[in-house]
C-alpha cells in the first residue's frame, strides 16, 4: 500500500454528517462537505451526494465514525435510524480497507495532534504530563467519553457508552430532576441532562416546579443565560454546568487522565468560554478527600470542528501502515 494513500473520511453525528478526503494522515480541508442527516436515509445516499458535488470517490481506504455503539465492525447510531457495517462501507467507497469506529474514538485518535490554537483552556493543572492518558468528553446531541492511551507508536482508544450511565445525585434537587427525567424516559441517564435537549429538560423542570412549564430551545436558553437576561435560564445553566463538572470529575477519577481532559461537541464548544462563570471547575474538583488530586487534570475545549475527521485520518493511516 502506498505510504501517501488517499482516504475517505466520514464523521456522522446526531444531526450532521461531514465527508472529506485525506492524503495519508492529513485531512484535506478544502474537500470537506456537510450534509443534514434528516435529508438522507443512509450513508450510501450521503456518499452519492458527495460524489455528485466533488467528483468520483477514488480512495484506497475509508474510515467512518458514528455517534453510537460499534461492535465487531457493525454500528448503530444512537439518535438516528442508520446501521452501518465495515463491508458495506468498503463497497460504497470502493476501497479495499474500511474502518468503523465510535465518534469519541475518532476524537481520541486525533487529540494529541491538535495545534495549540485549536484548544481553549478551561481548568489549569499543576500535574499534567505529556504522553500520559487523556480523556475526551463530548456534550452535543448526546453525551459520551473516551479514554486515550498512547503506547509507543500505537494509540489505543477503547469505545464506551458513558452517556447511558445513571445521572449522579448529590442533592434533593438532583433527585427531583432525576425523577422528572425518569417520568419522561423511564431511565434517568447522564445523556438525558448533559446534551442539547438535556439543557432544555432542565429548563422545563425548573418551570414545572415553579408552576410555569415554559419550554425553550437550548440555543435560546444559552443565549439568555450568558447575557444575563433570564433568571431561569441562568439557574438552568448553573445546574447543567454543575452536573457536567461532577460527571467529568467522576470520569477523571476513574481514568486518571494526567495528559488532560478534552471537551468536544456543539454544546461544550458553545459553553466553553462560559463554563468558569457557571461553576464548572468547582464542581469538577468537589471530590471530598480527593479534591487535591483533581488539580492534576487540565481541561481544554477543542474548538476545531474537524477534529474527528483528523482522528479518522490518523487512525486509518496507522491501520494501513500495518
Regions found by a protein language model. Give the residues of each.
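ATP-dependent carbohydrate kinase catalytic cores
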Residues: 97-129, 219-231, 235-241, 246
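Short beta-strand segments
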Residues: 11, 63-67, 101, 134-142, ...
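Glycine-rich phosphate-binding loop of actin/hexokinase-like ATP-binding domains
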Residues: 121-125, 129-190, 272, 279-285, ...
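Active-site nucleophile and cofactor-binding loops and adjacent substrate-binding regions
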Residues: 35-37, 79-80, 99-106, 125-128, ...
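ATP-binding/phosphotransfer module of carbohydrate and carboxylate kinases, centering on a glycine-rich
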Residues: 1-53, 58, 176-322
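Short, acidic Gly/Pro/Ser/Thr-rich loop/turn segments
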Residues: 17, 69-71, 142-146, 201, ...
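Short beta-strand-loop/turn "lid" adjacent to the catalytic site in phosphate-handling enzymes
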Residues: 54-118, 136, 269-273
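Short, glycine/charged-enriched secondary-structure capping and boundary segments
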Residues: 23-24, 77-80, 114-116, 150-153, ...
Amino acid at each position: 500500500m502506498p505510504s501517501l494513500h488517499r482516504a475517505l473520511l466520514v464523521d456522522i453525528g446526531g444531526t450532521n454528517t461531514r465527508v472529506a478526503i485525506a492524503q495519508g494522515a492529513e485531512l484535506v480541508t478544502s474537500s470537506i462537505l456537510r450534509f443534514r442527516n434528516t435529508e438522507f436515509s443512509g450513508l450510501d445516499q450521503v456518499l452519492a451526494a458527495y460524489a455528485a458535488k466533488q467528483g468520483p470517490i477514488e480512495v484506497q481506504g475509508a474510515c467512518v465514525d458514528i455517534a453510537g455503539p460499534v461492535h465487531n465492525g457493525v454500528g448503530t447510531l444512537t439518535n438516528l435510524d442508520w446501521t452501518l457495517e465495515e463491508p458495506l462501507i468498503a463497497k460504497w467507497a470502493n476501497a479495499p480497507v474500511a474502518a468503523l469506529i465510535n465518534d469519541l474514538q475518532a476524537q481520541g485518535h486525533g487529540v494529541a495532534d491538535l495545534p495549540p490554537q485549536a484548544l481553549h483552556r478551561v481548568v489549569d493543572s499543576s500535574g499534567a504530563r505529556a504522553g500520559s492518558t487523556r480523556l475526551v468528553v463530548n456534550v452535543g446531541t448526546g453525551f459520551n467519553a473516551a479514554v486515550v492511551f498512547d503506547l509507543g507508536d500505537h494509540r489505543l482508544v477503547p469505545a464506551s457508552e458513558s452517556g447511558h450511565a445513571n445521572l449522579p445525585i448529590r442533592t434533593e434537587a438532583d433527585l427531583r430532576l432525576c425523577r422528572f427525567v425518569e417520568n419522561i424516559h423511564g431511565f434517568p441517564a447522564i445523556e438525558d441532562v448533559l446534551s442539547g435537549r438535556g439543557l432544555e429538560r432542565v429548563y422545563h423542570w425548573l418551570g414545572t416546579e415553579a408552576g410555569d412549564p415554559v419550554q425553550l430551545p437550548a440555543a435560546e436558553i444559552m443565549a439568555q443565560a450568558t447575557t444575563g437576561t433570564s433568571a431561569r435560564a441562568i439557574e438552568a445553566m448553573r445546574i447543567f454546568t454543575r452536573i457536567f463538572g461532577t460527571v467529568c470529575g467522576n470520569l477523571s477519577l476513574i481514568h486518571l487522565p494526567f495528559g488532560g481532559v478534552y471537551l468536544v461537541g456543539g454544546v461544550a464548544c458553545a459553553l466553553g468560554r462560559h463554563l468558569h462563570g457557571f461553576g464548572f471547575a468547582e464542581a469538577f474538583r468537589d471530590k471530598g478527600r480527593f479534591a487535591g488530586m483533581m488539580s492534576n487534570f487540565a481541561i481544554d475545549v477543542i474548538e476545531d470542528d474537524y477534529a474527528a475527521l483528523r482522528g479518522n485520518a490518523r487512525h486509518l493511516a496507522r491501520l494501513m501502515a500495518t
